[in-house]
A protein has these predicted regions:
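ATP-dependent adenylation/nucleotidyltransferase module used to activate substrates
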Residues: 1-177
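Local cysteine-cluster metal-coordination motifs and their immediate loop/turn environment
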Residues: 104, 186-206
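Glycine-rich nucleotide phosphate-binding loop and flanking beta-alpha elements
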Residues: 126, 208-209
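Short amphipathic alpha-helical interaction/hinge segments
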Residues: 149, 209-212
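Short, intrinsically disordered, charge-biased short linear motifs at domain edges
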Residues: 173-176, 181-191
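Short cysteine/histidine-rich metal-coordination sites, predominantly Zn2+-binding motifs
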Residues: 212-221
Length: 221
């Protein structure tokens, strides 16, 4: 039986990866991280979509104590700002080493569940501003985990070379994915409906617009 664990935030990309995993693995579990983020919206979205997807296990793991370095996602005194501010240089929403922590903890849970595969929704398109979303980082992380285990281990990244437009078109071809995206949460400001101004909201809107598809969140609202 092929098994995998999906690193699942409840956002657009990880929801797409969760439903991709359901098509490609016979048994899928999800792991969601509480890392000190200022709002609960993404955790709630992850719980809702995991239930909708019918995953075998959905673990919610608190790693707040492992991520002391702050960002606008975790520090009450910082504001995520708007897209025009975030598009220049590294955005203040970057949490140093967050993906490294997520992948290592997810790998530990995967091994405990009898799996040698983790799926994550990182994209090389974000690599200029987020160094832990590059293919080079993923390859290095996969090799490090395999060495630490003394065994084969895979990190699958279905979206690594896709643009936001391509990600939307990819999701459209996956059974159940667009319906699930109705419940996903992307907004850095934790707003429902989404603020439409933060970096994450604008990139999501651009992706759906360029794909010529109405965002299911808008249809729901």
């Amino acid at each position: 039986m092929s098994k995998c664990v999906v690193v699942f935030s409840g956002g657009q990309d990880s929801t797409t990866c969760l439903y991709w995993a359901k098509q490609n693995y016979s048994s899928v579990s999800a792991i969601t991280f509480q890392y000190g983020q200022k709002h609960q919206a993404e955790i709630n979205a992850a719980k809702k979509i995991s239930e909708l997807a019918g995953v075998v296990e959905h673990w919610v793991v608190d790693v707040t104590a492992m991520l002391k370095a702050k960002s606008a996602l975790t520090d009450p005194e910082q504001n995520p700002g708007v897209f025009s501010q975030a598009s220049e240089g590294r955005p203040n929403t970057w949490v140093p080493l967050r993906n490294a922590v997520f992948l290592n903890v997810a790998a530990n849970y995967a091994v405990s569940w009898g799996s040698s595969c983790v799926v994550t929704g990182v994209s090389q398109e974000d690599g200029a501003n987020y160094p832990d979303t590059t293919n080079a980082f993923i390859v290095a992380q996969q090799n490090a985990i395999a060495l630490a285990l003394g065994d084969v281990f895979e990190i699958k990244t279905p979206l690594i070379h896709k643009t936001k437009k391509q990600t939307v078109l990819f999701a459209k071809e996956i059974t159940g994915c667009m319906e699930a995206l109705k419940f996903s949460h992307t907004c850095y400001n934790g707003m429902t409906p989404p603020c439409g101004r933060c970096h994450s909201c604008v990139l999501r809107a651009q992706g759906f617009a360029s794909a010529g598809i109405i965002d299911p969140i808008k249809m729901e609202g």
